[in-house]
């Protein structure tokens, strides 16, 4: 409860500071609308089917990207973490690809995939892969050898050890990787919508608000909603980890 109260106090302090800056003569009124204006516009936008369509498009594409990233990264991490030969053979390629920012791949993705949702989903998958993959590998590195030896004593084969011993032990690490990947994928998703000419999504909403009549209140509405989605994802996955895989 104390942590929750402190969190509320931190949010309240941030909003008060924002309100003061927004109404201060130090900044032009149109450059930083105060939260009282932004949240009023947020209420208006939440009644707009068009805005809801943008939010749903981003959230749906984000969920698809996370599911695809999990489907690729977890099996790959299990293989790389349990088969040293494969890990050594792929290390150079992985270390080359991992530092490349997803946004740097936008031109290539547009040429290959066009301007549809496939582009933002693919780039979000690329960004989300790495935290899940490396957390899975790390989890297998930390696997207690005693658990493996005990399973083998009872006649469990290599695949059985992998799926019934290694994977359950790795789940807390994997879920932490998914939590990190979800917020990273959200950042990439909105960035691609903003930069790659998407026709729907929060990034597109922000771009339209900024490039049209310069409605900074709408720009900040899109930004706030993206932040709220990130907080809900992060807190939801953390609660799942604590409740179901806290071992």
Task: Map each language-model feature to its residues.
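Hydrophobic alpha-helical transmembrane segments of polytopic membrane proteins
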Residues: 202-241
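Generic hydrophobic transmembrane alpha-helix motif, especially the helices
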Residues: 95-131, 138-139
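Short cytosolic juxtamembrane segments of multi-pass membrane proteins
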Residues: 241-247
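Short cytoplasmic-facing helical segments at TM-TM junctions of multi-pass membrane proteins
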Residues: 135, 139-174
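Periplasmic/extracellular loop-to-transmembrane helix junction in inner-membrane transport proteins
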Residues: 24-70, 208-211
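Transmembrane-helix boundary motif in ABC transporter permease subunits
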Residues: 64-94
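Transmembrane alpha-helices
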Residues: 122, 126, 158-191
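N-terminal signal-anchor/first transmembrane alpha helix
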Residues: 1-22
């Amino acid at each position: 409860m104390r942590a929750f109260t402190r969190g509320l106090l931190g949010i309240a302090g941030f909003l008060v500071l924002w309100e003061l800056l927004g109404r201060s003569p130090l900044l032009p009124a149109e450059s930083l609308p105060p939260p009282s204006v932004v949240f009023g516009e947020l209420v208006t936008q939440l009644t707009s089917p068009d805005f809801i369509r943008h939010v749903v498009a981003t959230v749906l594409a984000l969920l698809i990207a996370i599911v695809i990233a999990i489907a690729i990264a977890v099996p790959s991490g299990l293989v790389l973490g349990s088969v040293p030969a494969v890990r050594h053979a792929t290390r150079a390629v992985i270390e080359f690809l991992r530092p490349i920012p997803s946004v740097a791949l936008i031109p290539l993705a547009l040429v290959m995939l066009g301007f549809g949702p496939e582009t933002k989903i693919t780039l979000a998958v690329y960004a989300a892969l790495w935290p899940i993959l490396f957390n899975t590998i790390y989890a297998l590195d930390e696997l207690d050898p005693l658990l493996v030896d005990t399973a083998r004593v009872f006649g469990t084969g290599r695949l059985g050890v992998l799926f019934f011993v290694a994977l359950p032990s790795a789940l807390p690490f994997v879920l932490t990787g998914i939590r990190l990947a979800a917020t990273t994928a959200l950042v990439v998703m909105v960035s691609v919508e903003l930069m790659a000419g998407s026709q729907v999504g929060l990034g597109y909403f922000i771009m339209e608000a900024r490039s049209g009549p310069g409605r900074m209140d709408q720009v900040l509405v899109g930004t706030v909603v993206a932040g709220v989605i990130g907080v809900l994802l992060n807190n939801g996955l953390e609660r799942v980890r604590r409740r179901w895989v806290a071992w």
